Regions:
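Extended, polar beta-sheet/loop recognition surfaces of beta-rich domains
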Residues: 2-6, 97-148
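Detector for the c-type heme attachment site
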Residues: 3, 21, 40, 82-88, ...
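Sequence/structural segment immediately N-terminal to covalent heme-attachment motifs in c-type
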Residues: 62-91, 98-116, 182
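Sparse, context-dependent recognition of short Cys/His-centered cofactor- or disulfide-binding micro-motifs
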Residues: 1, 12, 81, 95, ...
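Flexible coil segments in periplasmic/lumen-exposed cytochrome c-class electron-transfer proteins
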Residues: 8-77, 124-185
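Short acidic alpha-helical/loop segments enriched in Asp/Glu that coordinate divalent cations
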Residues: 49-53, 84-94, 126
Length: 185
């Protein structure tokens, strides 16, 4: 991940993308091992199993109708790259099923990825195929539509509750515009 910005669990976003593009992708194998050992320790934690999908009524009252709308947005905007089941495409598009961003209890990074997109990942020696960026949908989707898409993705692919609200999306949309979060080119 630290050399390519891409793993089975997700892809680098925002500041981490810059760290990889401008720094860690140039590390030698020895330096990468040392850095990984420093970050994870000598005995890194075992991977955690993916939680089961939660029911549409979990969370803050976003019911099945909202999740159906979110599924519609997912199929229209996301499935062509990430697949209808969220499995991605090997080495070119990350899976969303089990993706660490989708599995986080705090949906902030997922909502920001939907709003502003993700940058391209350049080719590296370890990952010679450059990966395309993900477009942001800040201009195309309302706050309610982003919340519905995030909630569908979280429940169906990440085992998280449907607890993203339009008000939370509005706050993140405003903050993204002020903070310098960059839309994908």
């Amino acid at each position: 991940f630290l050399q390519t910005g891409f793993s089975a669990h997700g892809s680098a976003f925002d500041e981490m993308h810059e760290v990889i593009a401008n720094s860690t992708r140039y590390l030698t194998a020895e330096d990468m091992t040392a850095l990984s050992t420093f970050l994870l320790g000598d005995n890194p934690p075992a991977p955690q199993p993916l939680p089961a999908a939660v029911s549409p009524d979990s969370g803050t009252g976003n019911g099945a109708g909202t999740l159906d709308a979110g599924r519609g947005h997912y199929m229209a905007l996301c499935a062509s790259c990430h697949g209808s089941e969220g499995l991605g495409r090997s080495l070119t598009m990350p899976p969303l099923k089990g993706n660490s961003t989708v599995r986080q209890a705090d949906a902030r990074n997922l909502v920001l990825a939907i709003l502003v997109g993700l940058p391209k990942h350049p080719a590296t020696q370890q990952g010679p195929t450059p990966l395309p960026g993900m477009p942001g949908f800040m201009q195309e989707l309302t706050d309610g539509e982003v919340a519905a898409l995030a909630n569908y993705t979280r429940t169906a692919l990440g085992g998280q509750p449907a607890d993203v609200t339009a008000a939370q999306v509005a706050d993140l949309r405003s903050a993204a515009g002020k903070s310098g979060h960059k839309a994908a080119p």
